[in-house]
């Protein structure tokens, strides 16, 4: 059952009640319980049960009418909440009031009989006292309960493109397809590298340190007839750019791509081309084609994609390779900062593995970059009218509304809308924030808000990675008002 009033309408009623007196049951003057009942009657036409105020959360069935929250250190009350104080108030009967404002440190309420002046004449029925509904500030306490009515819905002015709107249903439309790779097998002729005698144990992904012109075709032209002296400087099994894969060595051959006997003999080497000269968009496409080729080969060999089968050049020797991928996906530049730390190495490997597994499952993954990297251009790009896109690949739009969390905690992030960003705090069930920005990033819809001078980023539903306005969204994790 929905309330007869919207939240804003009820808050206006609370404001008009200040200075008045309420004796709903016509007993013992103007009790705090009477004021709670007056508000409940305005909302639902019903009266609350309970011998004292402290009994309200337990003596009533709030199913469909309201949600009851027990106070926690991180709970944030909302205007319109009924707050119930425990038996350490009101001579054991508790106390009840209506919240009009709240922070994490205190609540401001309208209440009746806080000072005990609601019944002073000694006459039981109806009774009289001098105390009236008063606005007052209180600290949170334990135990304390907050009862949030199911208010009549209000229409919030939001863009039709906003991801806080109802989920866009996926309709029958062409699904994205993987790029059709053009695989050119043209084995080098200047030297017949030895055979391994078995399938590779996995794949080593390299960055070629090549210029913008160092495409797969360019490597083919330069190496396919190169002499042994040139091949000894290094030759991988495949070179990838755009949708082109040049296979320079047979799968059965060893390569000279890791400067390490184990890496050369047992692992198939793939170079992601143009890693020094291409723009980020081009290089990321080259990476995706590489992941697609890795998926094809692993399936062919009957191997899974994991940390044993997907390797990095820097696991075999001290090198900055794969330098460009490291910067884009971990934010760490091994060229300027030294060898890639182990945690960053695992972060990069796991990203590669996740992308490759998606291709192995017939899916089309979305390339993501670290919020610490300067991916794409340094300018904000307009996208799909209401949306813009920043240098980190984040789609964003201005929107002012209130998000109220549902029944599960949500991890809030600082710095930016990425799951890899530092944790701010746990956004508790029933908590709310007044946000000013909506973003699409890292598989989620995020809202941005400022609290006590700190900017926070809160994911509120999933996002399938499609660019707006064609995004497909999961269920909202709370309510927007």
UniProtKB/Swiss-Prot annotation:
Region (Disordered): 155-177
EC annotation from Swiss-Prot or TrEMBL: 3.5.1.28
Domain SH3b: 398-466
Gene Ontology BP terms: cell wall organization; defense response to bacterium; killing of cells of another organism; peptidoglycan catabolic process
Cited Gene3D superfamilies: endopeptidase domain like (from Nostoc punctiforme), Peptidoglycan recognition protein-like, SH3 Domains
Its job: Has weak lytic activity toward S.aureus cells.
Protein name in UniProt: Probable autolysin LytO
């Amino acid at each position: 059952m929905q309330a007869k009033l919207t939240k804003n309408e009820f808050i206006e009623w609370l404001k008009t009640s200040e200075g008045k007196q309420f004796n709903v049951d016509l007993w013992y003057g103007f009790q705090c319980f009477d004021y709670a009942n007056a508000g409940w009657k305005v909302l639902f036409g019903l009266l609350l049960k309970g011998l004292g105020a402290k009994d309200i959360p337990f003596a009533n069935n709030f199913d469909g009418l309201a949600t009851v929250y027990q106070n926690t250190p991180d709970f944030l009350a909302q205007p319109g909440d009924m707050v119930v104080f425990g038996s350490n108030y009101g001579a054991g009967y508790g106390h009840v009031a209506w919240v009009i404002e709240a922070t994490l440190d205190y609540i401001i309420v309208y209440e009746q009989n806080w000072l005990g002046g609601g019944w002073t004449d000694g006459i039981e029925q109806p009774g009289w006292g001098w105390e009236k509904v008063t606005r007052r500030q209180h600290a949170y306490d334990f135990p304390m309960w907050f009862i949030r009515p199911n208010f009549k819905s209000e229409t919030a002015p939001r863009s039709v493109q906003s991801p806080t709107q109802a989920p866009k249903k996926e309709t029958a439309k062409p699904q994205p397809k993987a790029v059709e790779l053009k695989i050119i097998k043209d084995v080098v002729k200047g030297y017949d590298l030895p055979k391994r005698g078995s399938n590779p144990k996995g794949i080593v992904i390299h960055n070629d340190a090549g210029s913008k012109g160092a495409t797969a075709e360019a490597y083919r032209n330069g190496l396919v007839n190169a002499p042994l002296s040139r091949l000894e400087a290094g030759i991988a099994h495949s070179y990838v750019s755009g949708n082109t894969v040049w296979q320079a060595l047979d799968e059965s051959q060893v390569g000279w791509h890791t400067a390490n006997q184990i890496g050369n003999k047992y692992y198939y080497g793939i170079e992601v081309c143009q890693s020094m000269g291409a723009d980020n968009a081009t290089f990321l496409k080259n990476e995706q084609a590489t992941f697609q080729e890795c998926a094809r080969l692993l399936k062919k060999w009957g191997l899974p994609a994991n940390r044993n089968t997907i390797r990095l050049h820097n696991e075999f020797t001290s090198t900055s390779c794969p330098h460009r991928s490291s910067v884009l996906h971990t934010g760490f530049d091994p060229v300027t900062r030294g060898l890639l730390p182990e945690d960053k190495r695992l972060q990069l490997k796991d990203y590669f593995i996740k992308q490759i597994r998606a291709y192995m499952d017939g899916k089309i993954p979305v390339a993501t970059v670290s919020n610490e990297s300067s991916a794409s251009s340094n300018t904000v790009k307009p996208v799909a009218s209401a949306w813009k896109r920043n240098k980190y690949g984040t789609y964003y739009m201005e929107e002012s509304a209130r998000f109220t969390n549902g029944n599960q905690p949500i991890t809030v992030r600082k710095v930016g809308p990425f799951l890899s960003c530092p944790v701010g705090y746990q956004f508790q069930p029933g908590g709310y924030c007044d946000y000013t920005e909506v973003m699409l990033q890292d598989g989620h819809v995020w809202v941005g808000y400022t609290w006590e001078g700190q900017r926070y980023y809160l994911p509120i539903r999933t996002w399938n990675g499609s660019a707006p306005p064609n995004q497909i969204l999961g269920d909202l994790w709370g309510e927007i008002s």
